[in-house]
Amino acid sequence: MNLFQAIILGIVQGLTEFLPISSSAHLRIVPALAGWDDPGAAFTAIVQIGTLAAVLIYFMKDIISIVGAVVSDLLKGKPLASDESRTGWMIAAGTIPIVVFGLAFKDDIETTLRSLYWVSAALIALALVLSIAEKHTSNRARQGRRGKAISEITWLDAMIIGFAQAMALIPGSSRSGVTITAGLFRNLDRETSARFSFLLSLPSVFAAGIYQLYKTWDVITASTDNMINIAVATVFAFIFGYLSIAFLLTYLKRHSTGIFIGYRLLLGISLIIMIGTGHLMP
């Protein structure tokens, strides 16, 4: 990987991590179309530290409030006394499924599931499920029922969204896509679904990034070029990730996810055609 490729992949990671179109799919597709080597699951996990930093900074006030409430309520012997501490514990509970599945299927995630067959299937499948979730949300709105706020999320909601997040281990699914979809089915409004999705991503993205950084440290530090490329990709992922968060939260206040559904279908079908005609190797 050269510096130009690192910059492009960092931008791709930042732009697509928080939109429901799958960053892992695009980090697999873009190199394939450009004739570059697959950067691999480890690169994806490490560069996600950049988008993790974007979430931390964008939601700094929320995170400080949640962490402060968890610590304060624990010291009082009432761990679930406030809405903020409940949210913190729900994020922790919702993280358990992706940790379990991530460890159980680690080898498949890094090899078999990176096939463009899986990527295209996941892009199309989630587009269809998200379209059903959107119809459910539209029906609720027509009935005059408002969506849940974060403080109204139940333990069942958190666990269902957490299990959905585990599906994002399949490239093409999209972490934000599956969690926003689950949130819509659980009657969260679109913006709240996205906001909870981003907060829920913090523990697992941090853990995966640190693990892959530790695991590949010798390779990364084997040359100055490797270190520079990873660092540059991570910085660009942070910048464009921050912009992506701001865009999506603003967009979902007034619009549905329809544009992303259409994009996923178009991309998934295009991939199948390109693979079938021999223009792209799976």
UniProtKB/Swiss-Prot annotation:
Keywords linked to the UniProt accession: Antibiotic resistance, Cell inner membrane, Cell membrane, Cell shape, Cell wall biogenesis/degradation, Hydrolase, Membrane, Peptidoglycan synthesis, Transmembrane, Transmembrane helix
Catalyzed reactions per annotation: di-trans,octa-cis-undecaprenyl diphosphate + H2O = di-trans,octa-cis-undecaprenyl phosphate + phosphate + H(+)
A single GO BP: cell wall organization
The keyword DNA-binding is assigned to this record: no
Membrane topology: Multi-pass membrane protein
Location relative to the cell: Cell inner membrane
Regions crossing the membrane: 40-60, 89-109, 113-133, 150-170, 196-216, 230-250, 258-278
GO MF annotations, alphabetized: undecaprenyl-diphosphatase activity
A cellular-component GO term for this protein: plasma membrane
S-S pairs: none
A Pfam family hit: BacA
Protein EC: 3.6.1.27
Record flagged with keyword S-adenosyl-L-methionine: no
Family indicated by similarity: Belongs to the UppP family.
Other known facts: Bacitracin is thought to be involved in the inhibition of peptidoglycan synthesis by sequestering undecaprenyl diphosphate, thereby reducing the pool of lipid carrier available.
NCBIfam families: PRK00281.2-1, undec_PP_bacA
General function of this protein: Catalyzes the dephosphorylation of undecaprenyl diphosphate (UPP). Confers resistance to bacitracin.
Entry protein name: Undecaprenyl-diphosphatase
Gene designation: uppP
